[in-house]
Amino acid sequence: MSDQEFDLSKIRNIGIMAHIDAGKTTTTERILYYAGRTHKIGEVHEGGATMDWMEQEQERGITITSAATTVFWLDCKINIIDTPGHVDFTIEVERSLRVLDGAVAVFDAVSGVEPQSETVWRQANKYGVPRIAFVNKMDRMGADYFAAVESMKEKLGANAVAVHCPIGSESQFVGMVDLISQKALYFLDETLGAKWEEREIPEELKEKCAELRYALLEELATIDESNEAFMEKVLEDPDSITEDEIHAVMRKGVIENKINPVLCGTAFKNKGVQQLLNVIVKWLPSPKDRGTIHGISLKNNAEISLEPRKDGPLAALAFKIMTDPYVGRITFIRIYSGTLKKGSAILNSTKDKKERISRLLEMHANERTDRDEFTVGDIGACVGLKFSVTGDTLCDENQEIVLERIEIPEPVIDMAIEPKSKGDREKLAQALNALSEEDPTFRVTSNEETGQTIISGMGELHLDILRDRMIREFKVEANVGKPQVSYKETITKNGASETKYVKQSGGRGQYAHVCLEIEPNEPGKGNEVVSKIVGGVIPKEYIPAVIKGVEEGLNSGVLAGYGLVDVKVNIVFGSYHEVDSSEMAFKICGSMAVKEACRKAAPIILEPIMKIAVITPEDHLGDVIGDLNRRRGKILGQESSRGMAQVNAEVPLSEMFGYTTSLRSLTSGRATSTMEPAFFAKVPQKIQEEIVKK
């Protein structure tokens, strides 16, 4: 596609999100097929899906990274991001939602809302992303569209409303009644679902469809009370309401996040996908509808507002980094204002560093097309950025706006890693550096005492796949240790320290003197280091060295060497020596001072707590709950339907290694579980003592 101008109102930036195995990638594949982007349908279970382009994805049949692509439908340009449904890859969902204007949530018609669907929905709530829903797999045994709609209301608190009525069910599912147009749509199998026939509503469904349509109209009237004419028509003459009127009210309700219309179909059997494409265009917002962009000025911390205009100042967000063996480092960006041209010099305002764009690329999974410019509303990729990482703002050199960052969760699991041979040491370091740039939830640290390299991530599958990538993409063979819990340390009261670092050994000595005050920061806020030095007691040029020393000191705690979190440090006083003071001396002194202060501030160890959902046959419920209690679990609640029970609990990660295997033997292989990091909590005293002893 050439760089043709696209009216902003005709762009849709959408994500496809769901629980693992609800059929997200298959739905995206069908969208690409019907919109003419691919000529052959790729199947996930055959390992041929276009959007699952990494080898690991094709082998495992799951989506790991958010693949991006662009399609055209009904005169609109739709940028689609297909996100992973596995909890270990939550950051991919989080960073996609941050840059999207709307989303399609895909649900399994048999299971309805599953635990990971709740996580993704919560993330979308956080960023206020308007959503429509697609109940997929209507051809499966036990499929129930209306039960899925109800489960969205109950479990997600969504204002879910049916806009379809299925015709037939399970293997007899042949189409649906569109409650807005009041037409029955029958799909023709011989055209792979590309064509369908519109017929009258079947006699046996007429009464039900009339009730459903009235319920839909009533709901629309309720969410837009300012539209009195529409409300009057609903009450007095609902049959006189036109399709256009319904679409207008629905669009407004979706954009304002007041309603979540629910469609049905089966992507695998090619039914209902074009209807989904139609409403993506009709109901989901364009960048124009999302309105003003807010950010903070670097100069004075005041709030800045920008309108989404092509001729406005540039404001873009880097939301993903990818390393390509041929092109190098690729940065995915979303442009909120202005235009970005190939070859232009820009500012990374988050880091206050200048960057230059060498190439602009439009992406289709892992294929790419060169572009001369991207403009407001575009999602694309650029080559040449050296400093930018996930969550950084890119802007004009004179603009200096910083947009809201992407929230990055703390890793919960650690593994030691070492190269198989000495020759691989440098390659391993490069691979780890590239992978941690791509994925902010993957951290690489060194254990000072043992000299081991430790990798940390969101779960065993996460680290497993990254290890796979090291072997395949970076050709590095590495040995890894057993997974360990990623504990953290923090403080529980205020503390202070006065530290002098003095060395005299002939010639020039070393001198630094630093006074610190520390206090607990609010949970989840991270560490903050602030200089309150006045009157030049520590010269200005040494302050960054003190801050760096403090930050390095916080990397390993005082109880068991785990990183300190949620600590606020104020550098309040100190002194220096005209000759003997140096940056190195102040850095060492800063590190010693913060450690000393932490020892006086009642330090504790924190452990990751996981939120777990177990779905089990009711006759095994007692065993499952008993087992979770033995693992220091806290049962949050349970619910039952159709002979199956779901137990929700919070359990320390340290108790959950090998849980899948023991759950299998406990329930004869009939139960399933999903787990995700919830928060960090204080370790019981007895366990803390054991950890410190180790």
Curated annotation (Swiss-Prot):
Question: InterPro entries from the entry?
Answer: EFG_II, EFG_III, EFG_III/V, EFG_IV, EFG_V, EFG_V-like, EFTu-like_2, G_TR_CS
- The tr-type G domain sits at 9-288
Task: Supply the alphabetized keyword list.
Answer: Cytoplasm, Elongation factor, GTP-binding, Nucleotide-binding, Protein biosynthesis
Q: Which GO terms describe its cellular component?
A: cytoplasm
Q: Name one Pfam family in it.
A: GTP_EFTU
Q: Does the keyword Nucleotide-binding apply?
A: yes
Compartments reported by the entry: Cytoplasm
* Residue positions binding GTP: 18-25, 82-86, 136-139
One GO BP annotation of this record: ribosome disassembly
Task: Note whether Nucleotide-binding occurs among the keywords.
Answer: yes
- Broad class of the protein's primary localization: cytoplasm
Task: Tell me one GO molecular function of this protein.
Answer: translation elongation factor activity
Superkingdom of the organism of origin: Bacteria
Task: Tell me, in a sentence or two, what this protein's role is.
Answer: Catalyzes the GTP-dependent ribosomal translocation step during translation elongation. During this step, the ribosome changes from the pre-translocational (PRE) to the post-translocational (POST) state as the newly formed A-site-bound peptidyl-tRNA and P-site-bound deacylated tRNA move to the P and E sites, respectively. Catalyzes the coordinated movement of the two tRNA molecules, the mRNA and conformational changes in the ribosome.
Similarity remark = Belongs to the TRAFAC class translation factor GTPase superfamily. Classic translation factor GTPase family. EF-G/EF-2 subfamily.
HAMAP family per the record?
EF_G_EF_2_B (MF_00054_B)
Instruction: Supply the name of the protein.
Output: Elongation factor G
Question: Which species is this UniProt entry from?
Answer: Chlamydia felis (strain Fe/C-56) (Chlamydophila felis)
